A protein has these predicted regions:
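Intrinsic-disorder/low-complexity signature in envelope-associated proteins
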Residues: 2-119, 123, 127-128, 481-495
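Active-site-adjacent helical/loop segments in soluble small-molecule enzymes
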Residues: 418
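Active-site-surrounding "flap" and adjacent substrate/cofactor-binding loops of secreted or lumenal enzymes
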Residues: 164, 168-174
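An alpha-helical repeat/solenoid feature that recognizes helix-turn-helix modules
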Residues: 80-120, 134-166, 179-219, 223-278, ...
């Protein structure tokens, strides 16, 4: 029931209510025996010049910990018995509800074509889920991304007839591979991505089992943060052995920061959460270039500008000069789904035996093309555009105005057109045959097409996944955690007393 501040019922308003009864979910005790994730995200080149975002999704990843993983979690209680799950404050608002998606689509530039593409993607993910609840190949990370994709559409276990069981199996997979004692989830990038998914899942379901897993996962993430504000691979808290300096990796920091923000909005508890959020702002500032842009492990102006800029927006620092300059650097960016075709063709010409020590086909192809590629084409001079544009699309959305409308005008039709579709491939909850759709860049990364499908679908749900960080609805929090807010500005983070 909606009440006004202080407890008084809002006058002269008709409030439509619905009695929610607990819905029994099938017994989930018989879960297939867990197999250790067999493949993890590979390393790719990251640090690149401006307008040529080529990114690494991961690097060397550790095996699963020696300690025993947590036992099978207790079966989910029907989440419909829990207080309304759509409580995420600030940028999340209540825009993922079925009744508000249409309004948000019209308000921010989405339409029937984008929503149809999203539904095809969700059905493709459902169809391609493995029996243990995961997605290949980097099973933990891809499962985290898939969960975030379903949640962005407002799909929840216990409520979504068509996708509820899919999400439930995915969440149970993450909880099953998590170390019961330490909270560690196997993998490198996998841990912060999975933590992000668990935190957001708790915020939307209030399920106590998910809460336990999310809070445990937060612990190694927060403890792995450097005094300088950043993170490095595997959340290693120690400085580099050779230089004695802390390696603050903007790409890795991006997933850590998103996980912290999701934890904050879900009101999860960790005594170090507030400080970690404030300190993370300093970490991104450390990697900001004086004239704008964010680098890999230090100041730079490359594709990671979108990562640093979005994270500063999400962490309440969009009015900081580093964030504003990052947006200026991105003014010349043009959205595109596809990898740069000539780069791929050039790589195909290079034989492995022709490579010298420390050379890769990618580095050689880049070097060759640098002599001929005109500057205006270098935006597409990348194998992993979706990694950068996942962040860039959100940056533009939060920036709003003509910046967003101009971006969306190009992004929306390009992404819808780029989706591959199989007709009548799966039945929906009503038994009707429906199409499935996916996205896949033309390179050889092992996590295609799951990663591309999730990142592209998330961009096509930006219209209702978030409220712009500059909107009045987004900035007025019920409980102000980091600092005070106003009706017109982002929540400000005080970074001066750490």
């Amino acid at each position: 029931l909606l009440v006004m501040e202080g407890g008084a019922v809002a006058p002269d308003r008709v409030i439509e209510t619905q009695v929610l009864e607990a819905e029994e979910i099938k017994d989930l005790d018989k879960i297939e025996e867990f197999e250790k994730p067999d493949e993890q995200i590979e390393d790719m080149d990251i640090d690149i010049p401006i307008n040529s975002p080529n990114v690494s999704v991961s690097s060397d990843m550790p095996a699963a910990p020696n300690q025993p993983v947590s036992p099978q979690p207790q079966a989910f209680e029907a989440v419909m018995t829990v207080k309304s799950p759509v409580i995420l404050k600030n940028i999340y608002g209540t825009t993922r509800n079925t009744g508000t998606r249409g309004t948000q689509l019209a308000r921010f530039g989405g339409d029937r074509t984008t929503e149809d593409a999203v539904m095809r993607a969700l059905r493709w993910l459902k169809k391609n889920q493995l029996t243990d609840g995961s997605w290949k190949n980097s099973k933990v990370a891809m499962t985290g991304l898939a969960i975030l994709t379903f949640l962005a559409h407002g799909e929840k276990p216990g409520e979504s007839v068509e996708f509820g069981e899919t999400i439930q199996k995915a969440l149970e997979y993450l909880m099953r591979v998590q170390n019961k004692e330490t909270g560690r989830i196997p993998g490198n990038y996998d841990h912060p991505i999975a933590t992000y998914a668990l935190c957001e899942a708790y915020g939307m379901t209030l399920n106590p089992n998910v809460k336990v897993a999310a809070e445990k996962a937060l612990d190694p993430l927060i403890k792995g943060q450097h005094p300088t504000g950043g993170w490095t691979y595997n959340m290693d808290p120690a400085p580099d052995k050779d230089t004695g300096k802390y390696r603050d990796d903007t790409s890795y920091m991006g997933w850590c920061a998103q996980a912290l923000k999701a934890a904050q909005l879900a009101k999860l508890h960790h005594e170090g959460l507030d400080k970690a959020i404030k300190l993370a702002v300093k970490g991104f500032k450390k990697n900001a270039a004086p004239n704008g842009g964010f680098g890999y492990c230090g100041p730079g102006t490359g594709g990671l500008t979108s990562v640093g800029t979005l994270c500063m927006q999400l962490l309440g620092a969009s009015n900081e000069p580093e964030c504003k300059k990052g947006l200026q650097v991105m003014e010349t960016w043009v959205p595109s789904f596809s990898s740069y075709g000539p780069l791929i063709e050039e790589m195909k010409k290079i034989r492995k035996e022709d490579l010298k020590e420390n050379q890769t086909a990618l580095s050689v192809a880049k070097s060759r093309l640098a002599k001929t590629v005109p500057p205006e084409e270098r935006m597409f001079y990348t194998l992993s555009p979706q990694y950068y544009y996942y962040y860039a699309t959100q940056c533009k959305f939060h920036q709003g105005g003509k910046h967003w409308s101009n971006w969306n005008k190009v992004m929306k039709p390009a992404y819808v057109k780029a989706q591959a579709v199989t007709k009548d491939a799966i039945k929906n909850d009503k038994g009707l045959l429906c199409d499935v759709g996916w996205w896949e860049n033309a390179d050889v990364h092992s996590d295609r097409p799951v990663m591309d499908t999730c990142l592209a679908a998330l961009q096509l749900m930006v219209y209702y996944r978030y409220l712009p960080t500059t909107s009045k609805e987004a900035v007025q929090a019920e409980e102000e955690i980091t600092a005070t807010s106003t009706d017109t500005e982002d929540i400000k983070v005080d970074t001066g007393n750490l």
